[in-house]
A protein has these predicted regions:
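Central cavity-lining transmembrane alpha-helices of secondary-active solute carriers
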Residues: 11-29, 223-235
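Conserved MFS/SLC helix-loop-helix module at the cytosolic interface between two early adjacent transmembrane helices
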Residues: 22-60
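Hydrophobic core of transmembrane alpha-helices in multi-pass small-molecule transporters
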Residues: 61-77, 191-192
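Intracellular juxtamembrane helix-capping segments at the cytosolic ends
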Residues: 76-90
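Symmetry-related core transmembrane helices of the 12-TM Major Facilitator Superfamily/SLC fold
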Residues: 127-146
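Glycine-rich segments within core transmembrane alpha-helices of 12-TM secondary carriers
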Residues: 91-114
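Extracytoplasmic gate region of multi-pass secondary transporters
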Residues: 175-233
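Flexible cytoplasmic inter-helical loops of multi-pass small-molecule transporters
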Residues: 148-172
Length: 235
């Protein structure tokens, strides 16, 4: 539609992602200043808006804005809100809870690629983005009612065990984290997979055409990726 090359799209995607990561540093900390449910509500609404914008792409500017909002609200703030909520909600079983919560993302990585490829065989891509936008908004009140209604963050686990007060985990400041060399060691291991996966996601069309693969090959690869992700979550 926009007559851009794979390389140009990759540059637009990378620029939008980089900008969203900088904005995430500022917006992400707002979750500490407001109700988590309200914060998550705004994030989901923004995700719906970004999905709708994809259906209206008519220029490179619109494409950049849509990718920026999608990366910020989707993989950025949605993951951030989920991890932050779980970390506050659990203390003794925090690691297990975080692993379980990520099953949602892995399940989506398993189901959605094949589903989207199938739907694109008889639904125009712009209509599909509109449908996704509507589905996100319609799902929101259901999720609120069944999962977070009247939930208090201090009700899941007791703060005492055998009449002993569990020591609180130290709350690090951002400057303390940046000064700790271990942070950069962890970053190298955590950033490797996202870089590799993002490259595969962005250039999946080019990879498929150059290898002469069918439309379902990449989608099936995502399914295998999600299965292995689930396995490693509990290792």
């Amino acid at each position: 539609t926009l007559s851009i090359s794979h390389g140009q799209f990759g540059s637009i995607y990378a620029s939008a992602t980089l900008l969203s990561s900088f904005i995430l540093i500022w917006i992400g900390k707002k979750i500490d200043d407001m109700n988590i449910s309200k914060f998550a509500f705004y994030v989901v609404v923004l995700l719906s808006i970004s999905s709708f914008l994809f259906s209206k792409i008519s220029s490179i500017v619109y494409l950049f804005i849509a990718i920026f909002l999608m990366r910020l609200s989707g993989q950025g703030l949605m993951s951030h809100a989920a991890s932050t909520t779980i970390s506050r909600y659990f203390e003794k079983s925090r690691g297990k809870a975080l692993s379980t919560s990520w099953l949602g993302l892995s399940s989506a990585e398993f189901v959605m690629p094949l589903t989207i490829v199938f739907l694109l065989t008889f639904i125009e891509w712009r209509d599909l983005w509109i449908s996704i936008s509507i589905l996100v908004i319609l799902t929101l009140p259901i999720v609120i009612f069944f999962t977070v209604k009247d939930v208090k963050l201090d009700t899941r686990e007791e703060t005492t065990f055998n009449n002993k007060i569990i020591e609180k985990i130290k709350q690090w400041k951002r400057i303390e984290v940046l000064k700790d060399y271990r942070f950069y060691i962890v970053c190298m291991t955590m950033l490797a997979m996202p870089w590799i996966a993002t490259g595969s996601f962005v250039y999946q069309s080019f990879i498929s055409s150059s290898k002469e693969w069918g439309p379902y090959v990449i989608a099936q690869s995502f399914m295998a990726y999600s299965i292995l992700s689930v396995i490693t979550l509990f290792i």
